[in-house]
Amino acid sequence: MTSIWLRPEGRQEQQLQALIDRFAEENGTVAFAPHLTVCGVPGDLGVVDAAAAYVRQCGLLPIRVAKTAVTGAVITPFRAVFIEVENSAELREFRERLREIVGARQLIPPHISLLYTLDRDTQAPRPDFDAERLQEIAARCADEIDDTHFTLGRPLVNNAGGGESNVRGWRAIREL
């Protein structure tokens, strides 16, 4: 699977990475780079050139979004503990336009994940993360995140290589 990401900028990226790394270590789960998934790229990567052209000319980046909540819920292994962010007009326009350009599926609500419920070693989903445990982790994360807004930019195309759940195989293949 291939997707387009926006990344937090500067200090925010460093703080979120430290938080993700620490909670992954504490919970025996995989660590990953902080990002907001703009959309998937479902087919031919030739559309990435058109996406890059849009990014260059749109004038929307970086986008500043408000944090609305830090949530823990059993949704998918990739949406277990996450920062919900405001779907501002700028973010919505950016995501929808890129979705149209690359032919992606309908978008899910914008968020920045903090914990995936994938085992650190096997990368298999961990059934021991119930709603209560995820809510407790989310509350701890919320206590450590002072920022009320996040600045997102530096778009890139990420490729999952060996499959979506092969988090260690994820690689940035192109900056937009």
Tell me what each language-model feature is.
Residues 156-158:
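Active-site-proximal alpha-helix that buttresses catalytic centers in soluble enzyme cores
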